[in-house]
Swiss-Prot record:
Name of this protein: Tyrosine permease
Main location: membrane
Cited Pfam families: Trp_Tyr_perm (PF03222)
Membrane protein topology class: Multi-pass membrane protein
Tagged with keyword Cell membrane: yes
GO biological process: amino acid transmembrane transport
Amino acid sequence: MVIKKTTPGLMSGTMLIIATVIGGGMFSLPIAMAGIWFPGASIILTLIAIMMLLTGLMLVEVNLHYGGGASFNTFTQDLLGHKWNVVVGIAFGFVLYILTYAYISGSSAVISQTVEKYSGFYLPARLSVIIVSVLVGGIAWYSSLLVGRITTVLIIGKFVAFFATFSGLIWHVEGAKLIDSAAWALPDTQYLPYILMTLPFCIISYGFHGNVPSLVKLYGTQGVKNITRSIFIGTAFALLLYIFWLVVTMGNISRADFSPIIAKGGNIDVFVEAIGGLFTSTSMDLILTFFGNFAVASSLLAATLGLFDYIADLFHFSDDRSGRFKTALVTYLPPAVVCFILPGGFVYAIGYAGLAFTIWSVILPPFLVKAARKRFPTAVYTAPCNNMILNLVIVVGGFVYLTVVLDVFRLLPSFS
């Protein structure tokens, strides 16, 4: 009897993209965008979404030349050589490590806040870091399948809690706060000086590019429509959700009121506490707490699973208990130690992740496409990008990279 292989539906790829890009990192958006506020933030998020969509489609074009199972290491090495491959490998590892640090920081902060809020017991941030690191490391050590199942539950819980919480807030949005009218604006208010510092946060908010090889592997070279549609729908959904998120936060918390949030470090626990102050209902405040915990926990598991697999492949650790223990140690110990020393760096880490992420999600794809179009006379799929667009994306990528470097050295104006 011939068993017919089931072709994955569009939903599988779309959910992969959505689950990857939408997570705890969205908590950093209102804080990062406070300087330019809602009108400017909406425009920049839209423009960056278009650019990230194009670079994602560029990777699809390149990846399809090599078929399912090929990843960045394969086609970067083949098309651009060993030096480029080393740079991309370092950037890839850096992004995953710094995101692991960011989500350990965010998770530990939210857990500490939740425990103190509902039990009255003060859980020190550093102790919370140890608990989170050991718990997540233990789950990853036990089974990648367990990580996947727990992540699925957390993602469902995250979206249910999100819409249950913020669909009510939409009716309390004040247009005057949203446009920062004179009644709410700070004295001598300015917006343009803060544009550059928002770019790294916007870039990382559409970080699905590492999943393009997974999509190609999922659908195969014959599933081009499902691959591209998954990316289109996932990116569009993320953009709309981010704008909705900014509407309900910036429409309820004025720009002036963001200053004390930022002054406290802008970590997730501080922001969740500020939003919690908007609710008069205890049950809604509880749902918000659940959302905060679900969001960062799902992001932590998803991001660290990618790093876990990358480390195992890089160091050729075996997939038995001993090998997975080594992998877990190399994966979680370095970011946990940094987080123990600097426990409140969630927002800053998300921004710094944009430094390396820009390399392999913005700058790398056009170079790969240029090389692939010279190498291969035909293509299964051609991204909607001519040479002018490819060059423009390279320039923009270089510009974004420069802004992150300037921000590291505190040479960019920051809203506070």
